[in-house]
Amino acid sequence: MSKPIRVRYAPSPTGLLHIGNARTALFNYLYARRHGGTFIIRIEDTDRKRHVEDGERSQLENLKWLGMDWDESPETHENYRQSERLALYQQYIDQLLAEGKAYKSYVTEEELAAERERQEAAGETPRYINEFIGMSADEKAKYIAEREAAGIVPTVRLAVNESGIYKWTDMVKGDIEFEGGNIGGDWVIQKKDGYPTYNFAVVVDDHDMQISHVIRGDDHIANTPKQLMVYEALGWEAPEFGHMTLIINSETGKKLSKRDTNTLQFIEDYRKKGYMPEAVFNFIALLGWNPGGEEEIFSREQLIALFDENRLSKSPAAFDQKKMDWMSNEYLKHADFETVYALCKPFLEEAGRLTEKAEKLVELYKPQLKSADEIIPLTDLFFSDFPELTEAEKEVMAGETVSTVLQAFKAKLEAMSDEDFKPENIFPQIKAVQKETGIKGKNLFMPIRIAVSGEMHGPELPNTIYLLGRDKSIEHIKNHAIRLYRSPLFLNALRS
């Protein structure tokens, strides 16, 4: 009988939730839910120098926002933070010391740096050289006594089996192996401050919590042989490992960097801009995995049912912000109005645009939104001065028939009564201009759209004109003429 599936996401509270870490959490979540396993959150807070206040809360809040839930965490279980488990780590460090599988090291940082410099100058691969090599028992005792008398606090190092072979069959990469002699020598498992190092603590935690599968990024591959050494030293069975490929920037082809300003890389950014969490969840799930086929829009339940670890990609996952925004637009277009309005409302309120037209404006621009915060620039037309035209828009408005179209349409608007001024009655007026002037297609619609809204593309033109209002639409047409045309006859005709 196979052992129960237990997986974990173990963030460090050192900042906001990055898209890469969110993917690690999400794949562990999908794997657990797909196979009826247990999903665990554990906080790895042993790096006190990088600890950020509220970092843990931020991580958990953003995971919840994405729609993930978990079975065990610091919220429900004691000692699920590494800082609460120091006594347990010390127990196993003492065991390794007693068994001669680890030892206290008194070498200083300055000595380590000098040795590293010597090795590099000699063209050697930097590695720790056991400080006790060649010492007799008496010399070793004297060395330790002198170091302790000088107030030097030791670290604890694991004694590495240099001839050992450390291998595993990776869930993603296949067979991987490392030689013990290529690890860099005996490595520190306990720092001078008494805290364990990552590669020691994570093994104790995973064993204690009975983790069956460790699914993480492939930047952890180099950590795996060190962790296997700890499993070997303590006589424990190691879990299965799966290392997901890197996430790269689709535009540069390089590893996603926090300096890539063309991407939103933190989940907090998506929350603040008003993305739907379901869209972000869907997008992240397809970074390095796909269920096959052409379909790309999946609900959470569908993703759980479809998730297959055997389809995790061996090639880097390309992060494409345009693809993310396309997917977000798909979700917003098909979401119910109440959901989208709730996302847009805070932005409208902050901008002082929560007027009687607010709901109509959201309804008008809902098909265009990629994120809820876009409702502000999209609705500038209704609350700000007429926008400056682009060169492409100016080129359209320099057409020979533009003045004819605008004069005719302005006259139609002026002739409409307040009672008749409705979206369903505006389109017939445009068609009437077509019939009167013989001008049709883009030559008809584009000048009207640009003159009224200042844009070549947008929502349905009659709805835009209706929400803008008859008087303001007429004003925009007049102002457009004043800006771009210098023909006295044309200006007089528009102003009459």
UniProtKB/Swiss-Prot annotation:
Gene Ontology BP terms: glutamyl-tRNA aminoacylation
PROSITE patterns: AA_TRNA_LIGASE_I
InterPro entries: aa-tRNA-synth_I_cd-bd, aa-tRNA-synth_I_codon-bd_sub2, aa-tRNA-synth_I_CS, aa_tRNA-synth_I_cd-bd_sf, Glu-tRNA-ligase_bac/mito, Glu/Gln-tRNA-synth, Glu/Gln-tRNA-synth_Ib_cat-dom, GluQ/Sye
Gene Ontology MF term list: ATP binding; glutamate-tRNA ligase activity; tRNA binding; zinc ion binding
Alphabetical keyword list: Aminoacyl-tRNA synthetase, ATP-binding, Cytoplasm, Ligase, Nucleotide-binding, Protein biosynthesis
Subcellular location, principal: cytoplasm
Protein's UniProt keywords contain Protein biosynthesis: yes
Residue positions of motif 'HIGH' region: 11-21
Gene3D superfamilies per UniProt: 1.10.10.350, HUPs
EC number: 6.1.1.17
One Gene Ontology term, aspect cellular component: cytosol
Locus of motif 'KMSKS' region: 255-259
PANTHER family recorded: GLUTAMATE--TRNA LIGASE, GLUTAMATE--TRNA LIGASE, MITOCHONDRIAL-RELATED
Function: Catalyzes the attachment of glutamate to tRNA(Glu) in a two-step reaction: glutamate is first activated by ATP to form Glu-AMP and then transferred to the acceptor end of tRNA(Glu).
Subunit structure, as described in the record: Monomer.
Name of protein: Glutamate--tRNA ligase
GN (gene name): gltX
